[in-house]
Amino acid sequence: MNFYVNQSIIINSIKIDSITTSSVFQIGTAGSIKALSKFSNTGGFTEPLRPLQAKGQIISIKPSTSSS
């Protein structure tokens, strides 16, 4: 059995407080939702972060600016 859905959706404003790695944001009807996972190094980091010296320690995680 096939169902055909025609939709017209108008969104004047939308606010999303947070998106996590397991979030699903859907507008309208989805016949199926397929899993997709992407890992991106958006900070330009080239090596692991150094270990913390004390619990609750605040450290800078700015990527190095050296060019290679």
UniProtKB/Swiss-Prot annotation:
It holds the Pfam family GerPB. Keywords: Germination, Sporulation. GO terms for biological process: sporulation resulting in formation of a cellular spore. Transmembrane segments: none annotated. InterPro entries: GerPB. Induction: Expression is sigma K-dependent and negatively regulated by GerE. Required for the formation of functionally normal spores. Could be involved in the establishment of normal spore coat structure and/or permeability, which allows the access of germinants to their receptor. This is Probable spore germination protein GerPB. It comes from Bacillus cereus. The lineage of its organism: Bacteria, Bacillati, Bacillota, Bacilli, Bacillales. The gene is gerPB.
